[in-house]
């Protein structure tokens, strides 16, 4: 589970078995885990996060999207 970014209480990561899926990132805080597709950016599952937190998370992803996609491609060799 490579962690690609930490911002405040949020950990952004993907699972090593995620290679077969479209490019995405998982976001974790405490016992909550959301999933967001990166191309284009869209919420897949909110994992118990509130709407306001999802909004914050999506803004972080928008600002870091290129780096997240690069980390995915570096890890999976795409």
Kindly label every feature range from the protein language model:
Residues 1, 19, 68-69:
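Detector for methionine-enriched segments
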Residues 49-78:
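C-terminal structural segments of small proteins and small subunits
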Residues 15-49:
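A short, structured beta-strand/loop element
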């Amino acid at each position: 589970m490579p962690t690609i970014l930490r911002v405040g209480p949020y950990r952004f990561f993907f699972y090593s078995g995620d290679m077969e899926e479209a490019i995405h990132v998982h976001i974790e805080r405490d016992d909550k885990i959301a999933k967001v597709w990166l191309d284009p950016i869209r919420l897949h599952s909110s994992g118990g996060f509130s709407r306001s937190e999802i909004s914050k998370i999506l803004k972080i992803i928008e600002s870091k999207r290129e780096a997240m996609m690069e980390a995915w491609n570096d890890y999976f060799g795409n």
